[in-house]
């Protein structure tokens, strides 16, 4: 493919494997579309799917997946640790090869229109946002599914596509956007005290005076009896994974808490891992040209 777009739809189902497989199957065996990865989390009750393909070819499988979510996920019955406002909660498009950000925004608008035609309210966010207030996903999703009926009464929060005055009664709303690649990364702690995780997340995230390009929140993992700091690094070239991990480690020491593991959610650029390898291994004068796979792909 000469033109490659990535899309990472997030679905509010992480426990029912039958429904998850129905959703993921929408992206299998499609012309000019490749399913790269999908991962589900029971505590978050969420599934993240990573797909690449020709921009036009991505539309049909995405609409099929929305329809599966519409038929099988009732947000009135949904619970989970991750903020959410819809059955397909977010759908970011990321340009990979031969595609400009302007074209990515146009695709987000086109897909948003198609989803809106299913009587589902659609909010554009990040680079595709229709106003500065909607660039930040956290602001768009504030109130979550339960709070959207009241929120959408405000003229400032009418949907960009689909019904303007309230969410779909079972599906809720969806945010469709255009952005550059980000790293979804979690740090697990050896405590079950959510207050500790919330404090650390507040110190680490940019909005709380922490690291630039980091969004973070504390999450309770009940099945494992621990908590984690769930993070999005929106520009890993400016704030790296190791910087985020080390700040979490530093703040955790205040409470006598240790980092016991980390998790990568979905896919991430190789360069993001190389940064951390250089730091922790103390590699001097390293170049991506020294990575075997990089040279093979040239």
Regions found by a protein language model. Give the residues of each.
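Long, contiguous binding/interaction regions
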Residues: 1-298
């Amino acid at each position: 493919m000469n033109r490659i777009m990535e899309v990472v739809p997030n679905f509010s189902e992480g426990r029912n494997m039958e429904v998850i497989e129905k959703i993921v199957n929408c992206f299998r065996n499609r012309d000019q579309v490749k399913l790269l990865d999908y991962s589900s989390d029971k505590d978050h009750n969420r599934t993240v799917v990573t797909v690449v393909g020709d921009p036009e070819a991505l539309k049909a499988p995405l609409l099929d997946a929305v329809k599966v979510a519409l038929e099988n996920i009732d947000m009135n019955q949904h619970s989970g640790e991750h903020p959410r406002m819809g059955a397909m909660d977010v759908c970011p498009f990321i340009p990979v090869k031969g595609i400009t950000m302007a074209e990515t925004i146009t695709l987000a608008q086109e897909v948003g229109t198609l989803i809106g035609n299913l009587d589902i309210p659609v909010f554009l966010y990040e680079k595709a946002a229709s106003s500065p207030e909607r660039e930040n996903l956290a602001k768009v999703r504030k109130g979550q599914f339960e709070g959207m009926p009241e929120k959408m009464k405000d003229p400032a929060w009418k949907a960009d596509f689909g019904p303007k005055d309230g969410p779909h009664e079972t599906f809720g709303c969806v945010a469709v956007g255009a952005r550059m690649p980000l790293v979804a990364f979690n740090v697990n702690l050896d405590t079950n005290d959510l207050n500790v995780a919330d404090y650390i997340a507040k110190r680490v995230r940019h909005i709380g005076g922490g690291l630039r390009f980091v969004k973070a929140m504390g999450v309770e993992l009940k099945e494992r009896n621990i908590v984690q700091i769930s993070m999005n690094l929106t520009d890993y070239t400016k704030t790296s994974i190791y910087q985020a991990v080390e700040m979490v480690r530093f703040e955790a020491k205040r409470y006598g808490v240790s980092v016991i593991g980390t998790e990568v959610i979905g896919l991430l650029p190789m360069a993001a891992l190389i940064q951390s390898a250089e730091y922790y291994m103390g590699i001097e004068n390293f170049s991506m040209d020294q990575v075997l796979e990089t040279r093979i792909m040239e």
